[in-house]
């Protein structure tokens, strides 16, 4: 593919795509549409897009007085609240960069991110002050702003109150036209290999991404969107930007835990939620909770979910409560949306119901603007036949072309310049209809006796068993077979003492060959997880690496 420059257009191509214009649009055209935020005391705060824009103007004025300048990196440690929402627009609106800090990381990793990004100012939720205090001395952060409704005490130097800063500021601000290729936010990968890697998102990338997300979820002003995905995780998947553009009502649930989803379900019911997004780590416990309570609630919700392969039991179970799971795929490096799954009309007409459910488990087809291909270990492109497994490589206008100030960039990309592709590390197939299926992470595929075993396939079949809540499969070194799979199973609470390894193996033997079955199935209370809720297979592999040396 070559690059050519054609005849010049007469369009205003110098008009820059800036993120602040999304909120300005909503405030102008949907000024009364509501934004709802659940506070730590479980009281509900309500205001409108029109009021939110005025507060963002106040925030912009306050940031200038704090000494925040164009290009400065400003850290945010917060839950999903209306103030985090304001910070995204206020910080980026003046030309600075929102550094999304994963509050579930170790303090040393948070300090690393702050130093690597050269964060000078940190906004921190009052409930996270102990974490900020533990990090502060390891960084060069000069100013701290506490996000709180109350008076607070802290050991942090030069600490300000968020609301006090905004209180007397002008509710008007002349936002600059920012070069659209400038960064508006940064997110650091969760560090599955070494320390976190920085991805810096441009205004242009996020505005284009927002348009595609709004289209993919068919967002409208009548919709009510709940932000379940942590807003520090790849811009909260960017859906709240798309919902803002559509003029949808926004619901921010604040701090919540998957082992107590009652407040979330109550909020979904009281606010009339119609759209949400989240990982199976949220939706599986949600299904378990809904199955327990009486009376059974009924929703009308379309929900994006991202996973290697969502369990059919989860998708079918939530469907009974009116929650339609739409499978999607992405990564921090892709802003994050790469593809989402919808059944093409011509396939819907000829596939059986079971075949449609199987199709829905695939990642889907790439969204407009994103290109994908499969390559082998030599970088050669592989066929899209639904069978050949290769590494999924991705490029597009909201895909990163490097990691910020990080030598690991070299090993993560192929190609040069605008022809560059990001190597996802995912083992995948692409079928003749364009549907991507993630088979596994390459590092999680199990090589046994020269043959590959997908840990994901084993996990999903285990999780389809009625007594199983969660299941994780890893490969561990074996003296004869190179690697062998072992499984970790968390039973549903009511079956904790009523489940056996033998019945699980019998269940799995109906689908898998004997050599593919786990050598061991361990019944455990919990499975370790990463900061973004995925199974921490690295932790398990380290713990069980000498398992066969005991024999």
Task: Put a short name on every predicted segment.
Residues 23, 65-66, 93-167, 493-495:
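Structural core segment of the AMP-binding/adenylate-forming
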Residues 31-34, 158, 167-188, 195, ...:
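Conserved pre-ATP/AMP-binding loop-to-beta segment of ANL
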Residues 35-81, 85-89, 106-111, 161-163:
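Conserved AMP-binding/adenylate-forming core of the ANL superfamily
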Residues 45-50, 184-208:
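Conserved AMP-binding A3 loop
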Residues 105-111, 120-124, 269, 276, ...:
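AMP-binding/adenylate-forming catalytic core of the ANL superfamily
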Residues 207-224, 234-274, 284, 289-290:
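Conserved AMP-binding/adenylation subdomain of ANL enzymes
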Residues 245, 273-278, 287-358, 371, ...:
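Gly/Ser/Thr-rich phosphate-binding loop
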Residues 349, 365-369, 377-413, 451-453:
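Conserved ATP/PPi-binding loop(s) of AMP-dependent carboxylate-activating enzymes
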């Amino acid at each position: 593919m070559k690059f050519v420059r054609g005849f010049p257009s007469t369009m205003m191509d110098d008009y820059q795509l800036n993120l602040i214009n999304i909120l300005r649009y909503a405030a102008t055209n949907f000024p009364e549409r509501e934004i709802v935020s659940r506070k730590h005391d479980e009281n509900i705060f309500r205001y409108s897009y029109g009021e939110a824009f005025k507060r963002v103007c106040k925030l912009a004025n306050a940031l200038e007085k704090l000494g925040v300048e164009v290009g400065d990196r400003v850290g945010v440690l917060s839950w999903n609240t209306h103030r985090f929402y304001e910070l995204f627009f206020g910080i980026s609106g003046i030309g600075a960069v929102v550094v999304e800090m994963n509050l579930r990381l170790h303090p040393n990793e948070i300090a690393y991110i702050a130093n690597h990004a050269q964060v000078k100012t940190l906004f921190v939720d009052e409930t996270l002050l102990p974490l900020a205090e533990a990090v502060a001395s390891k960084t060069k952060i000069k100013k701290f702003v506490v996000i709180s409704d109350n008076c607070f005490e802290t050991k942090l130097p030069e600490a300000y109150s968020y609301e006090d800063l905004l209180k007397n500021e002008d509710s008007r601000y002349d936002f600059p036209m920012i070069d659209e290729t400038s960064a508006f936010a940064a997110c650091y990968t969760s560090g599955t290999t070494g320390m976190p890697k920085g991805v810096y998102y441009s205004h242009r990338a996020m505005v284009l991404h927002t348009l595609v997300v709004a289209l993919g979820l068919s967002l409208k002003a009548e919709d009510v969107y709940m932000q379940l995905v942590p807003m520090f995780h790849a811009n909260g998947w960017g859906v709240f930007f798309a919902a803002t553009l559509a003029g949808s009502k926004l619901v921010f649930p604040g701090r919540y835990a998957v082992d107590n989803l009652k407040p979330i379900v109550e909020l979904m019911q009281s606010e009339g939620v119609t759209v949400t997004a989240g990982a199976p780590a949220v939706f599986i416990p949600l299904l378990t909770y809904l199955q327990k309570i009486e009376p059974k609630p009924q929703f009308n919700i379309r929900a994006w979910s991202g996973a290697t392969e969502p369990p059919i039991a989860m998708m079918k179970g939530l469907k009974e409560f009116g929650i339609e799971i739409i499978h999607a795929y992405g990564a921090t490096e892709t802003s994050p949306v790469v593809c989402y799954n919808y059944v093409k009309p011509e396939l819907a007409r000829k596939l059986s119901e079971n075949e449609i459910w199987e199709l829905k488990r695939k990642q889907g087809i790439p969204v407009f603007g994103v290109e994908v291909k499969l390559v082998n270990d030599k970088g050669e492109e592989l066929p899209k036949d639904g069978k050949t497994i290769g590494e999924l490589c991705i490029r597009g206008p909201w895909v990163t072309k490097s990691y910020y100030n990080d030598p690991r960039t070299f090993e993560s990309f192929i190609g040069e310049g605008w022809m560059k592709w990001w190597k996802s590390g995912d083992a995948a197939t692409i079928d003749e209809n364009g549907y991507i299926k993630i088979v596994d992470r390459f590092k999680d595929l199990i090589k046994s006796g020269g043959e590959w075993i997908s840990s994901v396939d084993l996990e999903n079949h285990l999780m389809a068993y009625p007594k199983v809540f969660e299941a994780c499969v890893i490969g561990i070194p074996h003296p004869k077979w190179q690697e062998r799979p072992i499984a970790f199973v968390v039973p549903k609470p009511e079956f904790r003492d009523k489940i056996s390894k033998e019945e699980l193996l019998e269940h799995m033997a109906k689908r898998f060959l004997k050599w593919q079955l786990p050598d061991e199935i361990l019944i455990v209370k919990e499975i370790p997880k990463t900061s973004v809720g995925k199974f921490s297979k690295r932790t398990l592999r380290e713990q069980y690496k000498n398992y066969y040396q005991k024999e």
